[in-house]
Amino acid sequence: MSRVCQVTGKRPVAGNNRSHALNATKRRFLPNLHSHRFWVEGEKRFVTLRVSAKGMRVIDKKGIETVLADLRARGEKY
């Protein structure tokens, strides 16, 4: 399972750890992903999405029905 938010598309990005001496070592910044069940009132069922914390806020703002319509338009499975 890839580390990508299904709602926002957030994915890991590369960067550096910096020590006190400013030595740079490569690292990855991972999105804050959670598998979360959302109740879809129109379909009378739960839908499980892998979303970031920001994705959950987007769902709270727009509503799950609108977000699922966007996912369907992109051709993404859920």
UniProtKB/Swiss-Prot annotation:
Entry keyword set: Ribonucleoprotein, Ribosomal protein
Listed name of the protein: Large ribosomal subunit protein bL28
Statement: the UniProt record of this protein carries the keyword Heme: no
Top-level taxon: Bacteria
GO cellular component: cytosolic large ribosomal subunit
Signal peptide: none
GO terms (BP aspect): translation
Gene3D superfamilies, per the entry: Ribosomal protein L28/L24
UniProt xrefs under HAMAP family: Ribosomal_bL28
Cited InterPro entries: Ribosomal_bL28 (IPR026569), Ribosomal_bL28/bL31-like_sf (IPR034704), Ribosomal_bL28_bact-type (IPR001383), Ribosomal_bL28_sf (IPR037147)
Statement: the UniProt record of this protein carries the keyword Glycoprotein: no
Gene for this chain: rpmB
Xref: NCBIfam families: L28
Alphabetized GO MF terms: structural constituent of ribosome
PANTHER family per UniProt: 39S RIBOSOMAL PROTEIN L28, MITOCHONDRIAL (PTHR13528), LARGE RIBOSOMAL SUBUNIT PROTEIN BL28M (PTHR13528:SF2)
Family: Belongs to the bacterial ribosomal protein bL28 family.
